[in-house]
A protein has these predicted regions:
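Extended, well-ordered protein cores
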Residues: 1-251
Length: 251
């Protein structure tokens, strides 16, 4: 097929598109990216040895590329479809984390590239958590949450069709890839309108705020992106007018 595109290229386009979308949803995040870029530049100007080390490792070009995002899903079926989606981008589940040990009712994995060449091209990963409804002790509330999740559709019909097309054909044209990225983004877009009534939301929130966040909205919105900084202490010690408060939007 002419004009096919690689998984690395799709992942790169997706990570850039997700960053742009998140900056629209959380304008403070764009300010954070500028702040981190300024700090990184200052660090490199004052540390020629580090600059040379990163240049020799071919890291300079990727310094301002986000490395990490995080999402939460509600059902095993949603997770299975995400696995298919991320595979198109060359991202595969790595490791297992049982966060219930820390009082968080999820278990998690990280979808990321796994071979050296793919990591060198674009190391973007998405930490993905699956809600554990069995940890809701109130049976009626647990069944209500299960029913809500069973009704929701977090993937657009066109996204599902493109996933199936890729699995059948093994490749995308550039046009297919662009459409796929745009359709995939809809799964991770923030929605202000909940899908439940106020009483249900508060009941789930009392059980755990994360349960309400997962169950009560129509998608698995990206809950944070993480830029790479060479000096986290300097970023956090910036003058007060520049500092971004997490509760204002960046989780």
């Amino acid at each position: 097929m002419a004009n096919t595109i690689t998984a690395d290229e799709i992942r790169e386009h997706f990570s850039q598109a997700m960053s742009a979308m998140y900056q629209q949803e959380v304008p403070q995040y764009g300010t954070l990216l500028e702040l981190v870029a300024d700090v990184n530049l200052a660090v490199l100007e004052n540390n020629p040895q580090l600059h040379e080390q990163l240049a020799n490792a071919d890291e300079l070009a990727r310094l301002n590329v986000e490395r990490h995002g995080a999402i939460r899903v509600g059902t095993a079926e949603e997770l299975a479809t995400l696995r298919r989606m991320f595979a198109i981008m060359g991202m595969y589940p790595v490791s297992y984390y049982d966060l219930s040990q820390a009082g968080v009712p999820v278990h998690s994995t990280a979808f990321r590239p796994i071979d050296d060449a793919a990591l060198a091209r674009n190391p973007f990963r998405i930490f993905t958590s699956l809600l554990r409804l069995e940890l809701i002790e109130n049976r009626a509330l647990r069944e209500r949450a299960e029913a809500i999740l069973a009704r929701r559709k977090i993937f657009t019909p066109r996204c599902l069709a493109l996933i199936a097309q890729y699995e059948a054909e093994g490749e995308f044209t550039s046009a297919d890839a662009r459409e796929f990225v745009q359709e995939a983004l809809e799964t991770f877009r923030w929605h202000r309108q909940a899908t439940v009534d106020e009483e249900t939301y508060h009941a789930l929130h009392r059980e755990h705020r994360l349960i309400a966040d997962v169950v009560c909205f129509p998608g698995c919105h990206i809950n944070h992106l993480t830029p790479r900084t060479l000096d986290i202490d300097r970023v956090q010690l910036m003058p007060r007018p520049v500092i971004l408060m997490p509760e204002c939007g960046i989780e």
